[in-house]
């Protein structure tokens, strides 16, 4: 299915009006939908509604779709005719499809189903009618444009569902897990080891950097089901997952997991998902989700670096606060996969508020000493305490500044082409990205994920 010129013009003509209303438009949409379809409160993070993070994410997505709709339509017209899509056309749409891939992974972790797209579409059109235009012809064209986008997501999400379910140890929707271990890492972080409730059952191996969605149902604590994603910190294996949960005093689920969930308790868990991961495929091995992907999403991986084939390419892991969790899975994986024999320079650069809340220091130091001698660990502390020792508890005082790490500067000067993976709070992420851009690091070597509703991963 492709779109007519009438549809393209209608969307392009009204997209600016939606953008001009800003989050007031998407906030009105969510208020309408969650009032009339209360069951969706079991899916949406209501805290993100209050902070307007979700309305802002939807606004960005709608505007991005409207701005790209003509080029997207041209792509599908070429595909429908069996004609090749020029490389420059793919390049122009890489940002859109990268964002779509991240959203599709989020949706599958929530267990989104095709019927729910019809609910969203009905309320989106009603909001356009209430706030943008009552022109029936324009509304009819927007309905076609929305269905076009919905079909794209429904198809991709089914590909992801099927690929994950088809893996050894895989499943669809949720599965019951038991908390095998709960460990307090420090005053604000707890670690949970999760195993299938069925004795002896295995799990699908995640890709280092992916996350689990935890479905929390506790009527005495929450009026509605709560769903949260937590990065997996364990290396890929077929027996268990480990997650680390940062206690947010303003949060609901993190406090619940810290205070009320204990060893032996049961949790409902979706399979591992996420498009932010370390791509490491041995010869003749293909990632499950890639085998199922349609052409436009396979193109996202066509130029991706396979670190199994690039044994000396440097990897730089940069984290702020709890952002270290997906990177810890990557580091553990590299320690297992490459170990002492690796010729690859690896950096672990971490920024923490102070040494008291810095997590996993002992483990990272142990990995460096026993498994990855090529690992260079660098710590920035915003707040240095009187008992902290430079060179042991931290390397640099203050906010993260990559220019202070001479080895990184040398790698860039020597054209070693290091790849940077970074995760953390919004301000931290912005600072790191700006510093890398200042060093003229191309997007192809920048990989990031922001915790929250939406920001495209590179």
From Swiss-Prot:
Give me the residues that bind NADP(+), please.
321-326
- What does the entry list as the binding residues for FAD? 211, 228-231, 450-453
Asked whether the keyword Heme is assigned, the reply is yes
The domain of life for this entry's organism is Eukaryota
Conditions for induction: Expressed at very low levels in untreated trophozoites of the parasite. Expression is markedly stimulated in nitrite-supplemented medium. Induction by nitrite is probably mediated by NO, likely generated upon reduction of nitrite. Also induced in cells grown in the presence of the NO-donors 3,3-bis(aminoethyl)-1-hydroxy-2-oxo-1-triazene (DETA-NONOate), and S-nitrosoglutathione (GSNO).
Q: Which SUPFAM superfamilies has this protein been placed in?
A: Ferredoxin reductase-like, C-terminal NADP-linked domain, Globin-like, Riboflavin synthase domain-like
Q: Which residues form the Globin domain?
A: 2-158
Pfam hit, one:
Globin
- Which reactions fall under this protein's catalytic activity? 2 nitric oxide + NADPH + 2 O2 = 2 nitrate + NADP(+) + H(+); 2 nitric oxide + NADH + 2 O2 = 2 nitrate + NAD(+) + H(+)
Which InterPro entries does this chain map to? Cbr1-like_FAD-bd_dom, FAD-bd_FR_type, FNR_nucleotide-bd, Globin, Globin-like_sf, Globin/Proto, OxRdtase_FAD/NAD-bd, Riboflavin_synthase-like_b-brl
Swiss-Prot/TrEMBL site (Involved in heme-bound ligand stabilization and O-O bond activation) positions: 30
Q: Which UniProt keywords apply?
A: Detoxification, FAD, Flavoprotein, Heme, Iron, Metal-binding, NAD, NADP, Oxidoreductase, Oxygen transport, Transport
| Catalytic site positions | 117, 157
Per the record, the GO terms for biological process are: cellular response to chemical stress; response to toxic substance
Its assembly, as annotated, is: Monomer.
In the record, the note on similarity to other proteins reads: Belongs to the globin family. Two-domain flavohemoproteins subfamily. In the C-terminal section; belongs to the flavoprotein pyridine nucleotide cytochrome reductase family.
Name of this protein: Flavohemoprotein
The organism encoding this protein is Giardia intestinalis (strain ATCC 50803 / WB clone C6) (Giardia lamblia)
Gene expressing this chain: hmpA
